[in-house]
């Protein structure tokens, strides 16, 4: 299954706010109206919608998300929490959380076009897994910095999660640590996502 490129508002109306996909928000009560029209949700549908939330927010294909679930399942600790850590530490998501992009697809484009360096080297892989003490900078060229400055100016001021530090004037972000669960930027029940995949096998 390919990455979703359809109408974004249609997705947030069904699944709720997906800040990584779009800055738009569903109207208050729209999800309740949808639920009343379709009747009581089955447990399968509830798990499916949580999985879809995760997939659309982070901009992943079905195959990519399944791969992350399998990696998380082999790691120590809670599979759901490890899954969220893996997704949150992707380079495209780190740029989004720093405010250097308004959405994760936008952050992915910055990376794909060679505007972003990690520890002084250009990284053009959006799924690159950032680690504590990684330094993310914008390429020292006028077009790269003007592009990111415009995005920084356009992004709504939000408190940075505690695992990140932003030095705006240096066009630089620092990864301080692995993200805490409470700082994840999406309202999600990750256990339902793990359950969804465990029942598919």
From Swiss-Prot:
GO biological process per UniProt: ribosomal small subunit biogenesis; translation
InterPro entries: Ribosomal_uS4 (IPR022801), Ribosomal_uS4_bac-type (IPR005709), Ribosomal_uS4_CS (IPR018079), Ribosomal_uS4_N (IPR001912), S4_RNA-bd (IPR002942), S4_RNA-bd_sf (IPR036986)
Coiled-coil ranges from the UniProt annotation: none
PROSITE patterns associated with the record: RIBOSOMAL_S4, S4
Origin superkingdom: Eukaryota
SMART domains: Ribosomal_S4, S4
Gene Ontology molecular function terms on file: rRNA binding; structural constituent of ribosome
Domain S4 RNA-binding intervals: 89-152
Record keywords: Chloroplast, Plastid, Ribonucleoprotein, Ribosomal protein, RNA-binding, rRNA-binding
Region (Disordered): 20-44
One CC-aspect GO term: small ribosomal subunit
Compartments, as annotated in UniProt: Plastid, Chloroplast
Subunit structure: Part of the 30S ribosomal subunit. Contacts protein S5. The interaction surface between S4 and S5 is involved in control of translational fidelity.
UniProt similarity note: Belongs to the universal ribosomal protein uS4 family.
Protein's job: One of the primary rRNA binding proteins, it binds directly to 16S rRNA where it nucleates assembly of the body of the 30S subunit.
PANTHER family referenced in this protein's UniProt entry, alphabetically: 30S 40S RIBOSOMAL PROTEIN, SMALL RIBOSOMAL SUBUNIT PROTEIN US4M
Family annotation (NCBIfam families): PRK05327.1, rpsD_bact
Name of this protein: Small ribosomal subunit protein uS4c
Lineage, broadest ranks: Eukaryota, Viridiplantae, Streptophyta, Embryophyta, Tracheophyta
């Amino acid at each position: 299954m390919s990455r979703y490129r359809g109408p974004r508002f249609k997705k947030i109306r069904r699944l709720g706010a997906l800040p990584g996909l779009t800055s738009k928000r569903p109207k208050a009560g729209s999800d309740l109206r949808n639920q009343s029209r379709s009747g009581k949700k089955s447990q399968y549908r509830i798990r499916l919608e949580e999985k879809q939330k995760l997939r659309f927010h982070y901009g992943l294909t079905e195959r990519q998300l399944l791969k992350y679930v399998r990696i998380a399942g082999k790691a120590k600790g809670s599979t759901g929490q490890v899954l969220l850590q893996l997704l949150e530490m992707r380079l495209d998501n780190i740029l989004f959380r720093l405010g250097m992009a308004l959405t994760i697809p936008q952050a992915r484009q910055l990376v794909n076009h060679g505007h972003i360096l990690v520890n002084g080297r250009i990284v053009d892989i959006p799924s690159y897994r950032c680690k504590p003490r990684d330094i993310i900078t914008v390429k020292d060229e006028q077009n790269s910095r003007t592009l990111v400055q415009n995005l920084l100016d356009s992004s709504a001021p939000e408190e940075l999660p505690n695992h990140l530090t932003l030095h705006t004037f240096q066009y630089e972000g620092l990864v301080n640590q692995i993200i805490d669960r409470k700082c994840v930027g999406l309202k999600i029940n990750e256990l339902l996502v793990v359950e969804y995949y465990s029942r598919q096998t």
